[in-house]
Regions:
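Cyclic nucleotide-binding regulatory domains
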Residues: 38-100
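Cyclic-nucleotide recognition modules
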Residues: 22, 73-131, 135
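Polybasic "coupling" helices that flank or enter modular domains
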Residues: 99, 117-187
């Protein structure tokens, strides 16, 4: 469970463990490979594992009314997910799937719980992560319910930029999303997402080539996102 950036170091549990705990994790850690769009876990299943994304991209989503899907959160490398339901003693209330071919590690939550009971530093790590996620969820609810379509799509593009960054050209988002996924992230129909993207292209805020999106005017996108 190595990390490279400052944020990744903050998210890594390794630094909060003693040598015996590290050995227990190494012995129990299992690596899984997921294909593009493959389900990792489904809403209603019982939570058994702590999931850690090692490589690739993962989305957490929930099926809504009329077959609509809402993407709740994007997972990036060296980020843990899927543990809230276990702590709440309830089934998963959302699903997770791979955006692209991804490598994910698992630890039994029974092991994690045992270590938390004996290690306050590890307990505080999960308290911190749950608190951050709750704050992010509150912000997302406000954004999705109060912003207009342009503001919601601009917000989605900024989230993708902040989560995954750019390719080497410093313009192309390092994630290639279907229009449907972009719409599900922005709480709008696919047709509205396509029209709004076209509007951003006309305003020279972005360029679009298939699923490749290049951000040409990030300050203006952030302004649109901020003021909705």
């Amino acid at each position: 469970l190595h990390s490279t950036s400052r944020r990744q170091r903050q998210m890594c549990i390794r630094d909060r463990l003693d040598n015996d705990e590290k050995r227990r994790i190494i012995d129990a850690f299992v690596i899984h490979n997921f294909k593009k769009n493959q389900m990792i876990y489904a809403e209603g299943e019982e939570p058994e594992y702590l999931w850690c994304l090692l490589q690739g991209k993962v989305k957490k989503f929930k099926d809504g009314v009329g077959g609509r899907v809402q993407i709740l959160r994007l997972i990036r490398s060296v980020q843990y997910f899927g543990y809230r339901a276990y702590f709440a003693k309830e089934p998963y209330n959302s699903s997770a799937a791979a955006f692209e071919p991804s490598i994910v590690g698992t630890l039994p939550m029974t092991l994690v719980e045992d270590m938390i009971n004996k290690n306050p530093k590890l307990a505080w790590f999960f308290i911190h992560e749950l608190s951050r996620n709750l704050g992010g969820s509150d912000t997302k609810i406000v954004n999705l319910t109060q912003k207009h379509i342009r503001g919601r799509l601009a917000e989605a593009l900024i989230v993708l930029r902040d989560h995954y960054g750019f390719e080497d050209d410093n313009m192309t988002l390092r994630i290639y999303m279907a229009r449907e996924d972009l719409a599900n992230l922005s709480n709008m129909t696919t047709s509205n997402a396509i029209r709004t993207l076209s509007g951003f292209v006309s305003e020279r805020l972005i360029t679009v080539d298939g699923r490749r999106i290049c951000i040409l005017n990030e300050p203006m996108l952030r302004k649109i996102s901020k003021f909705g």
